[in-house]
C-alpha cells in the first residue's frame, strides 16, 4: 500500500512539474536559487491569477503577512502579522524563506542585516517573515512586470553606513 501511494505521489509530482513548466512566467521564478517546483506550483495555486492584484500589499494581505499594530489610546502595542489570510500560502512562504536564507547568498545577507542592524534589529522569526513578505514583492514584480531576478537589487535594501560607501 505504501509503495503504491509513493509511486502515485511521484506520478502526480511529475504531472505538476509538467504543468508548471507550461506556465510562461514560472521559469523565471525557478531561476531564483532556493525556489523549486513545489514552491512555484504552491504559490501559483494559492494566488491564482496575479493580474487581479493591484499591488504586492494585496498579496501580502492574502497571505496574512500584513502588519497590524495592537494599540489603544496612548498605549502603543507590538506590531505583528495579521494572520488573517491563507494559512497554506503563509506556511509555504515561510518554508521558502528558510530555504532561501540557507541557500541564497542575497537572502542570507538580507536576513543577517535584519537581525544585526543597529536600529530596530529583528528577531530571527520576524526576519524570516520580513523575507517572506519581500519574496512576495519579488514574485509580484517578476510575474506582473516580466522583469528578471536581479540579485543586486535584492541587496539594495541593506542600508550600509556612510563609511563603507565612501571611495577609498
What are the language-model segments listed below?
Residues 1-168:
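A detector of single, family-specific signature residues
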Amino acid at each position: 500500500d505504501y509503495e503504491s501511494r509513493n509511486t502515485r505521489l511521484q506520478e502526480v509530482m511529475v504531472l505538476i512539474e509538467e504543468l508548471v513548466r507550461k506556465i510562461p512566467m514560472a521559469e523565471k521564478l525557478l531561476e531564483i536559487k532556493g525556489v523549486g517546483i513545489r514552491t512555484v506550483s504552491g504559490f501559483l495555486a494559492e494566488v491564482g491569477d496575479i493580474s487581479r492584484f493591484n499591488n504586492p500589499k494585496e498579496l501580502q494581505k492574502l497571505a496574512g503577512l500584513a502588519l497590524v499594530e495592537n494599540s489603544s489610546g496612548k498605549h502603543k502595542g507590538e506590531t505583528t502579522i495579521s494572520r488573517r489570510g491563507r494559512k497554506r500560502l503563509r506556511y509555504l512562504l515561510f518554508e521558502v524563506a528558510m530555504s532561501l536564507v540557507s541557500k541564497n547568498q542575497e537572502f542570507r545577507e538580507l536576513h543577517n542585516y535584519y537581525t544585526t542592524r543597529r536600529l530596530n534589529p529583528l528577531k530571527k522569526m520576524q526576519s524570516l517573515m520580513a523575507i517572506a513578505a519581500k519574496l512576495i514583492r519579488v514574485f509580484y514584480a517578476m510575474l506582473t512586470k516580466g522583469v528578471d531576478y536581479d540579485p543586486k537589487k535584492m541587496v539594495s535594501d541593506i542600508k550600509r553606513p556612510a563609511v563603507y560607501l565612501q571611495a577609498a
